A protein has these predicted regions:
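Short, hydrophobic/aromatic-enriched beta-strand segments in well-ordered soluble domains
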Residues: 47-49, 53, 66, 151-165, ...
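Glycine/proline-rich low-complexity spacer/linker segments in large multi-domain proteins
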Residues: 76-88, 160-214, 605-620
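Non-catalytic accessory/interaction domains
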Residues: 235, 363, 462, 475-620
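N-terminal, polar/Ser/Thr-rich
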Residues: 19-44, 56, 73, 498-499, ...
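Solvent-exposed beta-hairpin/edge-strand motifs
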Residues: 61-128, 182-183, 219, 223-224, ...
Length: 620
């Protein structure tokens, strides 16, 4: 165990050394002991948090998230469910019809024995009593002694909680019947960075945490099997598939067992428990272990295991090495949700859906947890990038998408439908502030993918692949921002690309280029293109003559101040002068008579986000 943790520490130090120019980061190291009553779903715990203030600021208060308090009538989450036009169907009852829905918040109907609850009963700092108060899901602690820059303090608390009825992500008795899905269950230190405290109320969307180490002991009924973040420290005492080969598990007359987990260099700790969990374990060639915990639908859960080992290897190669000693796929929660070193996901799905969910959640281990952008502020950097590599894995490893198909057509169509709906909002919108869940989902999952596909279109696939790998190398464990990523892309490609980040993600501008005019100029042909919308793009254009021979014409975008490699190497390429965005039209001459032209096509493989492809074709 010490060798594993030492290797992880060396790995983290190496990555940190690469990115010394990044801002400082706070550190929160947790020691927690919690006792769960599995009959009434209530628990009590203690927490010792060693907080390292690496900032240049003196901190006189600190804040904690109390996420479970969102699952109470009249909470902000409850209010949002009653006001948003398209609430999450899992969180509401429909008193009307599918055509004319009348939504009722499930949270509003919770009884006192069904609500979520997280309450602090005592709080101290370095042995001195601390004053605290809470409003909904945020706890404010006024410190008796300010935390000076570059100093540590120890915060101790006792707390009690109640696991809510399963409504979203965490709770009791999941749709698959898993007893406990314990995500965001403990008082969690709010992130403090160069922007200050991120005291965001929990409304059901994304998270942003503080890096730290977790030492967690969980005591509950001895018949339960526990799975979660971290490495189990007492496997030969607990058994349940954790034990070393050949070890005989000691019997106990006690009614409870205490499970001891340690997770290093993570920003969250999640667990699930059920007395009927089956546990399958696989050891990879590098010594890392992959775990599967499930209680129902064993055929599909068995079937996905060899596939997920292949996907794990694919992600290691595609992005970079997974640094932690293990990862667990756990039946629990609703849908699928990513956490530190594990995922909770529903199991009652068809194989294609289950393996797709597992692939998506595993990909989050790199983007949501290892790179760890502020996903509340930039959900598209997590969900979009995750969906991008999920889609590639589904095509290249799982073969769920035919090899001859362009894999991102679904993302484009989803984006196009959002544009047509008139509901699109700038993708820089905070995840909690979207007017509709529809606009949020398309922006985060689909437009986030398209951000990468359009970089591929602008600078070439090889440059994009190098960008993703370098992004991992330079920003693992560093909470990168959109600007950090685009600067990597600029360095790799040699292009100027800040404008693309601004235009595509910070506005709702769209692209529409058209073939405006095709005219004879003696033995040459003058082709005039027109920009009809505000989003700039370079242009790929195919000209096919009557003999069936195709010529590729590339029109660079001036503001990139560069050219991409030939993305169609099987066709001769002509590079014409760059097109400046301020010019609505662009004309160039082709050394081919008009009467010999059969067709002209903009973006022949439909790789750009042009919203109107009908005006991209000229045929005689």
């Amino acid at each position: 165990m010490r060798k594993i943790l030492l290797a992880l520490s060396i790995f983290a130090f190496t990555l940190n050394a690469i990115a010394q120019d990044n801002p400082w980061q706070q550190q929160a190291d947790y020691q927690m002991n919690v006792t769960m009553d599995v009959k009434n779903f209530q628990y009590k715990g203690t927490q010792k948090l060693t907080y390292t203030n690496n900032s240049p600021d003196t901190l006189r208060v600190v804040f904690y998230h109390l996420y479970f308090n969102a699952f109470q009538p009249n909470s902000e989450m409850d209010s949002k469910l009653q006001s948003i036009p398209d609430p999450d169907r899992r969180m509401v009852n429909n008193l009307g019809t599918d055509k004319n829905p009348i939504y009722e918040s499930r949270i509003a109907k919770l009884s006192p024995s069904e609500i979520g609850l997280l309450r602090i009963t005592a709080m101290s700092q370095d042995g001195q009593k601390a004053t605290f108060s809470h409003e909904s899901t945020i706890l404010k602690v006024t410190l008796p002694t300010p935390i000076l820059p570059h100093s540590k303090t120890v915060l101790n608390m006792t707390f009690e909680g109640q696991v809510p009825v399963m409504i979203r992500r965490a709770g009791r008795n999941s749709p698959d019947g898993v007893a406990l899905s314990m995500a965001q269950w403990y008082p969690k230190m709010v992130a403090y960075d160069h922007q200050g405290w991120h005291t965001t109320e929990y409304l059901g969307r994304e998270f942003y945490g503080v890096w730290g180490n977790f030492d967690v002991k969980i005591t509950l009924d001895k018949t339960y099997v526990v799975a979660g973040s971290g490495v189990l420290q007492n496997p030969n005492e607990m058994g349940c598939g954790y034990e070393d080969k050949g070890v005989k598990i000691p019997q106990t007359k006690a009614k409870t067992k205490t499970w001891h987990f340690v997770a290093e260099r993570v920003h969250d700790f999640t667990w699930a428990a059920d007395p009927q969990f089956t546990h399958d374990k696989h050891t990879l060639t590098d010594g890392k272990t992959i775990h599967f915990f499930y209680k129902k639908y064993p055929e599909n859960w068995k079937r996905i295991q060899p596939d997920m080992l292949k996907v794990f290897d694919y992600f290691n190669t595609f992005i970079g090495k997974y640094p932690w000693p293990q990862y667990s796929f756990i039946q629990g929660g609703d849908g699928g949700m990513e956490y530190a070193m594990c995922t909770l996901m529903e199991g009652g799905k068809k194989y294609e859906s289950l393996v797709g969910t597992a692939t998506h959640e595993l990909a989050h281990a790199w983007f949501q947890h290892l790179l760890a952008t502020d996903e509340a502020a930039y959900p598209w950097m997590d969900e979009g990038f995750t969906s991008y590599i999920q889609t590639l894995a589904e095509q290249q490893v799982l073969h769920l998408i035919p090899a001859t198909n362009y894999p991102f057509t679904k993302a484009y169509n989803g984006y196009l439908n959002l544009v047509k709906s008139g509901l699109q909002e700038p993708t820089i919108t905070h995840s909690d502030r979207y007017a509709t869940n529809y606009a949020y989902s398309i922006a985060a999952y689909y437009k986030g993918q398209l951000f990468l596909t359009q970089l591929d279109y602008l600078m070439g696939n090889e440059a994009l692949m190098k960008t993703l790998k370098r992004y991992y190398r330079e920003y693992a464990f560093k909470n990168p921002t959109p600007n950090d990523f685009i600067r990597i892309a600029e360095k790799v490609s040699g292009m100027q690309l800040q404008w693309f980040l601004n235009e595509f993600m910070q506005t709702d501008h769209v692209a529409d280029y058209a073939i405006d005019k095709v005219e004879a100029k003696g033995n040459k042909t003058a082709i005039t293109l027109k920009r009809l919308e505000r989003l700039p793009l370079s242009i790929d254009l195919f000209v096919t003559d009557k003999a069936g021979k195709t010529q590729y014409v590339y029109v660079p975008l001036r503001m990139t101040y560069g050219e991409k490699p030939n993305t169609y190497p099987n066709y001769p390429r002509t590079v014409v002068p760059a097109w400046g965005w301020g010019n609505l039209t662009y004309t160039f001459e082709l050394d081919m008579p008009l009467n010999n032209i059969q067709s002209i096509v903009l973006d022949p493989n439909n790789r750009s986000v042009d919203i109107n492809r009908e005006n991209n074709i000229y045929k005689k």
